[in-house]
Amino acid sequence: MKAKTLKKDKVNIITLGCSKNLVDSEVLSGQLAANEIDVVHENSKLDHNIVVVNTCGFIDKAKEESINTILDQIELKRRGKLDKVYVTGCLSERYRGDLEAEMPEVDAWFGTLELPLILKQFEADYKAELLGERMLSTPKHYAYLKISEGCNRTCSFCAIPLMRGKHISRSIEDLVKEAEALVQKGVKEIMLIAQELTYYGLDIYKERALPKLLDALADVKGLEWIRLHYAYPSKFPLEILEVMQRRDNICKYLDMPLQHASSSMLKAMRRNITREEMSELIHEIRSRVPGICLRTTLIAGFPGETEKDVEELKEFLQEHRFDRVGIFSYSHEENTSAYDLEDNVPAEVKSARAQEIMEVQQEISYEKNQEKVGQIFKVLIDKKEAGRYLGRTEFDSVEVDNEVVIHSKKKLAIGEFVQVKITKAYDYDLEGEVVG
């Protein structure tokens, strides 16, 4: 049954999972608002009557969170607090048939590419001319820019292609228009995201076009920081580094998930790269862009992982001293090629290995942060909390990296850039004072 778009209707969008999901929710919000439907994000006031849950289905913990959130909304509906509950996103795409049977209280389920169908529930029209128009749920000074959808890689552990489909690039023209629209809204920093950045353009331009896209975005007036997330290491286009070095508003920052460093694990994961090749690439990146911040993500407990593999990974971290590291325990996902392997590393061992690896990185992070004491950095003010300002350098992305705690006698504006001298350093944070 369709939701009646009466004046009293107010839609709350709850977003779970990654920044790519967040962009999808912002696009949906923009379309609803353009159809004169009242919409909010993560509304805790319970003054809405319709909910759209945008789910994540990436790993077990994410699936659990998504299911619990849906159940919470169903309970609110049962108590008469909500009229409608709709579910979209990766969990819905992947398990819709099962979930429909288990949760009949949900009014409708949608996949990841069914925005027009969601809008039909509100008797709203999909407005193609609004491509790129979004209702931002982030602070107005930064936003994510999703440059493509889906992924053509075949990593053995990853279920994302099952939920998001094959790689589809957006055109450079459309992305530049969206970036310009974001800057008009007050955005100063854009984080480029995709399942895999470096594949960008191969489908529509028959070449790896990320360097051309970066050059075009760097020309957008008023865009002060452009940040790159999720670059695949195999066949990495080195031309990206030339653009990064040449253009001042492209952050000297690269998020490159490596997943492991043991060659046997990399082969089992189908990463199409060896430890030696990764080492060569890291040296090349750092030689071409001195001072670059390298972030990576790792997996602990992949099937067949031995203590020797873990030691190799720790040695790799100590050798290459990444600036930022995140780690996940392996999740055994059905319909992936790794699902045919025995999930033979116990959960407690996965957790212990992840902790062990992060302890190595924690020491590296502390040492690298200590080196920053006394230096002056350009810092973007993100928020004010407990009487202190919190910001980031160009070497830190939102939520996952260092924060700079800023002491200032004068009032600072959220979204303002200031020069900060670092006075103290901790494992994952810095302190400093405004200078100049």
Locate the predicted segments by residue:
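Conserved, mostly hydrophobic/aromatic
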Residues: 155, 175, 192, 228, ...
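Proteins enriched for Cys/Gly/acidic motifs involved in redox and nucleic-acid/cofactor modification
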Residues: 1-200, 239, 250, 254, ...
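Conserved glycine-rich "GG(E/T)P / GGGxP" loop and the immediately following alpha-helix
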Residues: 57-62, 187-212, 216, 220, ...
